[in-house]
Design a protein with these regions (language model features):
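Basic, flexible Lys/Arg- and Gly-enriched helix-loop patches that mediate nucleic-acid binding at interfaces
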Residues: 1-198
């Protein structure tokens, strides 16, 4: 079994191939093309992504009943108070569904402004957003055991925020190696493999 950790950069699709958009597989050399991503991160999301040739790993890490927590750090437009984080922790109705998110861990990290986050702003909206550089930004964490499409973004939206920067930091006890620059990858160590095999 091969398992690699990648610090997925923004701008890459988590897929084996796509006709029109770059994928994470394009960041890997030919000898690692037999690997596949474990789960997916949105194109504009960065952070911990696992790649493996073990089909059972997906099931073990991704199915909600296995309770493997994924930790995300987000920045969102707007000022979300503690009550919003309490609501996300209890579960919120996800837009476009009749589904209540499962209970999660959610906590506030702090506040900044659009001006403080200029380098992280979506390029197409940069100039428009910088017209109001003092607009508040909320920084927070969400730890989820389920992984619905756009879940973090939808949960934050349900409490009045709009995520513009999102990074996955960990899967279970396995944390992203912060020494990896965006787009870099490495094989898991024996100790790290144990963390995802338990």
């Amino acid at each position: 079994m091969q398992v690699y950790m990648m610090n997925k950069p923004k701008g890459y699709l988590t897929a084996r191939s796509d006709r029109n958009r770059p994928t994470v597989m394009e960041l890997l050399p030919q000898e690692l093309q037999a690997l596949h991503p474990v789960g997916r991160l949105d194109m504009d999301t960065e952070g911990l992504l696992l790649l493996t040739d073990d089909g059972m790993l997906d099931r073990r890490l991704l199915r909600p009943e296995h309770h493997v927590e994924k930790l995300y750090f987000f920045r969102a437009f707007g000022r979300l108070e503690q009550e919003a984080f309490d609501r996300m922790a209890r579960g919120v109705l996800l837009e476009g569904t009749e589904v209540l998110s499962r209970p999660a861990r959610a906590w506030l990290s702090g506040y900044s402004t659009i001006g403080d986050c200029e380098a992280l702003l979506p390029p197409k909206k940069h100039n428009h957003l910088m017209k109001n550089p003092h607009r508040p930004v909320t920084e927070g964490y969400l730890a989820l055991c389920e992984g619905r499409k756009h879940q973090v973004k939808l949960m934050v939206k349900a409490v009045g925020g709009h995520v513009f920067a999102l990074k996955r930091l960990s899967i279970g006890a396995l944390r992203l190696d912060e020494a990896l620059k965006p787009g870099e990858f490495r094989p898991l160590t024996a100790a790290e493999l144990e963390l995802i095999s338990e």
